[in-house]
Amino acid sequence: MPRSRINGNFIDKTFSIVANILLRIIPTTSGEKEAFTYYRDGMSAQSEGNYAEALQNYYEAMRLEIDPYDRSYILYNIGLIHTSNGEHTKALEYYFRALERNPFLPQAFNNMAVICHYRGEQAIRQGDSEIAEAWFDQAAEYWKQAIALTPGNYIEAHNWLKITRRFE
């Protein structure tokens, strides 16, 4: 049974109903419908913290999905899971891949910046200020891109850029 039929969450049920209606009325191929079903089930599993199941669904959705824009969101969600699991190198790889297909994902730039900032803080704790500065500079570049795409968002990042004199 598809995951969307067993989820008891009201919002997930509502999303599933709306998604099913859209799948019926919007002209799509069976492959696109199947890809979306896997994507939807991946999001449901991810929201419940079932990351292994979510990844399986996302990988299957990637196999079926041909639209670069839709693939970007699948890749982004895979990156989120790797971030949650502390697999930052893998997460960065998936965020990069998502941005290759859709350069207008400010949340991917933000998450990449957060990872770089975290690595900068780790370098400071290890006593390597030069490496830390390089990570912080990279974080700044990603945050600038996120802010440029969505002015008014990422206020904490914007303040950090000003405080550290990295905002131009």
Curated annotation (Swiss-Prot):
Which InterPro entries does this chain map to? Answer: PSI_Ycf3_assembly, TPR-like_helical_dom_sf, TPR_rpt, Ycf3/AcsC/BcsC/TPR_MFPF
Places the protein is found? Plastid, Chloroplast thylakoid membrane
Q: Which GO terms describe its biological process?
A: photosystem I assembly
Tell me which UniProt keywords the record has, alphabetically.
Chloroplast, Membrane, Photosynthesis, Plastid, Repeat, Thylakoid, TPR repeat
> Topology with regard to the membrane?
Peripheral membrane protein
Q: Where are the TPR repeats?
A: 35-68, 72-105, 120-153
Q: Which SMART domains match?
A: TPR (SM00028)
UniProt-listed PANTHER family: CELLULOSE SYNTHASE OPERON PROTEIN C (PTHR44943), TPR REPEAT-CONTAINING PROTEIN MJ0263 (PTHR44943:SF8)
Give the UniProt family note.
Belongs to the Ycf3 family.
UniProt protein name:
Photosystem I assembly protein Ycf3
Q: Which organism is this protein's natural source?
A: Vitis vinifera (Grape)
